[in-house]
């Protein structure tokens, strides 16, 4: 499965966590101390609402458990791992001058420095866990950053983990019938990723 994901495959894993663990993680995320920020965080704006406004917090409590579940699923050892909780307030998205509609910023995810000389940074594997049932929410995947219509669209379903290469262009999808969008993103590197 790792080769499939690293070759731009997208895999879905329904009921990834046992219900009790899923509810505990959801409760943890709702009680985190989030930092008001924006994406892309490397750019400078007059204020955060001029970009893609969001709230973020690193999540640590269940990382050993999540990492172990992923290793069992993928049949490989994870060598680097981080989990990031992200909350999006849809009223803030509405006032952003970026004129977001259904899709947020089309982007690629976190990269890591390769150990091979003269080889460009490579994408980590990304995982997205949803905490709401939103047919119009979820994640859209694109062939390139300039596209306005996604090639693949995956709706948000609670406790469904979506795994993909961080090198695929993608964007969050917004369901404006909700006030907030809460997700847990995992970024990791496995053995053999040099």
Report residues per predicted region.
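Non-heme Fe(II)/2-oxoglutarate
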Residues: 1-95, 99-103
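Catalytic core of non-heme Fe(II) oxygenases with the double-stranded beta-helix
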Residues: 86-194
């Amino acid at each position: 499965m790792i080769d499939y994901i690293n070759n731009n495959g997208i895999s879905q894993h329904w009921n990834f966590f046992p219900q009790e663990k899923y509810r505990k993680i959801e409760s943890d995320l709702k009680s985190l101390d989030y930092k008001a920020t924006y994406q892309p965080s490397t750019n400078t704006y007059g204020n955060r609402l001029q970009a893609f406004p969001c709230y973020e917090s690193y999540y640590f409590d269940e990382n050993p458990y999540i990492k172990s579940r992923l290793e069992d699923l993928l049949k490989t050892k994870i060598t680097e791992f981080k989990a990031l909780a992200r909350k999006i307030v849809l009223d803030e998205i509405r006032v952003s001058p970026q004129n977001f509609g259904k899709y947020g910023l089309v982007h690629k995810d976190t990269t890591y420095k390769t150990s091979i000389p003269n080889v460009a940074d490579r994408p980590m594997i990304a995982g997205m866990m949803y905490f709401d049932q939103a047919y119009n929410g979820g994640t859209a995947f694109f062939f390139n950053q300039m596209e306005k219509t996604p090639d693949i669209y995956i709706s948000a379903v609670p406790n469904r983990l979506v795994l993909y290469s961080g090198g695929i262009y993608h964007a969050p999808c917004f369901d404006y019938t909700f006030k907030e969008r809460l997700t847990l993103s995992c970024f990791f590197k496995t053995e053999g990723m040099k």
